[in-house]
Amino acid sequence: TPDTEVDTGNGIMNMYGSKMRDHNWHRGGYGKIDVTRILEVSSNVGVSYLIDKHYKDNPQKFVDGLKRMSIDQPLHLQIPGEGKPNIKGPKERYFAKTTLPWMSIGYETQVPPINILTFYNAIANNGVMVRPKFVKAAVKDGEVVKEYPTEVINPKICSDHTLTQIREILRKVVSQGLAKPAGSKQFSVSGKTGTAQISQGAAGYKSGRVNYLVSFCGYFPSEAPKYSCIVSIQKPGLPASGGLMAGSVFGKIAERVYAKDLRFDIRSAIDSTTNVIPPVKAGEMNEA
C-alpha cells in the first residue's frame, strides 16, 4: 500500500553480494520512508527491497504481473523501425538472484520508450491501453479512402483501486518529488523519472566510459488527462538526472502544448455589461 514503510537505511543495501544504491547514498540516504515517498524520490533501495521481499520465492509471479499489463507486447506501429520489448523470466538463462531486484528498477530488461509511453497513456486513460497511431485516415482527392480506428491492446491493465493509488502517487512525484521541473503553475502534471546507466555491450555496465539514459514519462492535466509524453535523453557521464534534465524538457513541451490548446468558451466569457473578455491563460481571467 502507499503508506507501507521501508527502512532504506543509509542508501546502500546489500543484495545477494551486490550493492543497491540510492542516488543520495553519499549524503546518508533517505532512512525510513513509505511507498509514496519511495517513488517520489526514486529510491532504488526501497523499490528493490519491496519487490525482492514479496517475489523472491516466486519471481515468475512478478514477471506474469508485468505481462498482464501488456508492457511487453509488440505494438505493430504504422511506421517501420519498432523496437521489440524483452522481459525475461526465471526459466531463462542468466536469471540470477540479483536479477529480480535489478529488474524492479529497470535493468536487465529492454522496453522501448514508445512502449513505456503506451503504458503511461493507459494509466491516464483509466486503465485502457490503446495502440499508438500516427495516421488517422488516408485521404485521396479530398476524400477519405481509409480510416484507422483506435485499437485497444488491453481493456484493463489493473484494478480501479490500484489505478487510483498509482495516479495519486504519480501526481505527487511531480508536485513534491524529484520531478518538480516537469510541473507547471498553470496545470497539474503526473509522471515518473528514470535515470539508468547504458550497458556497453559485452563490457556491460563496468566499462570505463559510462553513458546514461535520463527520462521522464507522464501525462497532463492530471485530473482529466488529455496528453501523454515521454522525454528520453542519452548523455555521457555525470551529472545525470531524469527529473532535472528530461523533466525540464517535458515541462516546456507540456506548457507549449497546453497554451495552444486553451480555448475559452466565448459564451461564458461575457459579463453583465456584455463585454467580451479576451482569451487568456487558465486561471488568469482577472488579468484580462
Whereabouts are the PLM-identified features?
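Short, well-ordered alpha-helical segments
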Residues: 60, 164, 244-252
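Short beta-strands and strand-coil junctions in structured, solvent-facing domains, enriched
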Residues: 237-239, 259-260
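Short alpha-helix boundary/capping segments
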Residues: 158, 209, 238-249
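Beta-lactam-recognizing serine transpeptidase/beta-lactamase-like catalytic domain environment
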Residues: 1-233
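Short, gly/Ser/Thr-rich active-site loops of penicillin-recognizing serine hydrolases
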Residues: 144-151, 247-288
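Intrinsic structural disorder
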Residues: 38, 109, 207, 236, ...
